[in-house]
Every structure is written in C-alpha cells, then in structure tokens.
Amino acid sequence: GINPFDQPDVEASKIETRKLTDEFEQTGKLPAETARITDDGISLFCDDANAAALGLDEATTLSEAIRRHLGRISTGDYFAMLAYINMNSENESALRQIREAVLSRNGNATCLGFGPRFLHSTGQAYKGGANNGVFVQVTCDDAEGVAVPGQKYSFGIVKAAQARGDLDVLFERGRRAIRLHIAGDVREALKRVGNIASGTK
C-alpha cells in the first residue's frame, strides 16, 4: 500500500538544508554561489546541466535565458513556481500573471507554491515523481529577522538554506530548474519576469 507519511525526497531536502545551516554555524555565512546572469537586481542561478541545456554564456541576457527555460515546457509537462518570498496578495497576483502567461502560450498545467510550506506536500512530487516539471524558484533578500534559539543563524537564514537545499535536490534529480533571486523591489521584478514570459519584453 501507500504510506502517506513516507516522504524520502522531503528528507533529502532537509539533509541539504542542514548542511547549509551547519556551514553558517561554523563560518557565519552560507556557502558562496555565483550567478549565471545578473541584470537590474535579478540574478539567475542553475547547475551546470541546466546551464548547458539552456546554452548560457556571457552573452546570454536574462530575458533570453528565461524564455529558453520556459521553452523547455513540452506536451504533458507542468510548470511550477516555487516562491520563497512573502506570501501576500501583491506577490501572489504578480506570480499568477507569470503562470497565466505560460498557460496562455503553452496550455500546460501550472502551479504555485510558497516556500517552505509547500515542501511537505507538492515538494515530494516535484522531486520524487515523474520528470515532467519545469521549475522556476524565486528568492529575495529577506531581512534576517529573529534568531533561532541556541543557534547563530536566524529564521531568515534557515529560509534561504531551505530554498537552496531544495533546489540542489531538484538538480540532483535532473529536473529542469532555475532560481531567480531578487535583490530589489520584488513586485517590480516579478512584473518584469511576467512581461518576459508573455513575450512583451
């Protein structure tokens, strides 16, 4: 039978998250990472396999990279946005516009999850299910906020580690995934991504 509490791929994300928070505990910072593209406050991150599949090089613009990534959505695929940003009506509306742009162009199913809450539900399917998802993870510069009792890191650092850890597992599973990190105004950046997705920019 099916054990609804068996979530091996959720545990894999937890393991990667713990590695990152342990690193912060020891060094006072998360491991360094290098963006593939940075443009006007939006940085794109992905592993070597996705970078190669997207044909990224020094001349690739952010718009080109996003369009190429969305162009990987084929018949039978779904598109998922994994948003590690504040869950509010403004952000949800901006993310919905991106989903609607993909839906109107491709006709594929789309879904949205706010992290880290989705990790214990759809997060298992994304990593342990069929490889028919195309993912865009969205993160931003959160205020570090309240410290975790007994630890050197804050809940903001934990959230960042959860996002990076989950993305690492998606990469390990060979998923088509990128991360867009927003350093400035989140709503304006999402609007820009929506324009790119709809082909208006």
Residue ranges and their predicted role:
Residues G1-K201:
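Phosphate-moiety recognition in structured ligand-binding domains
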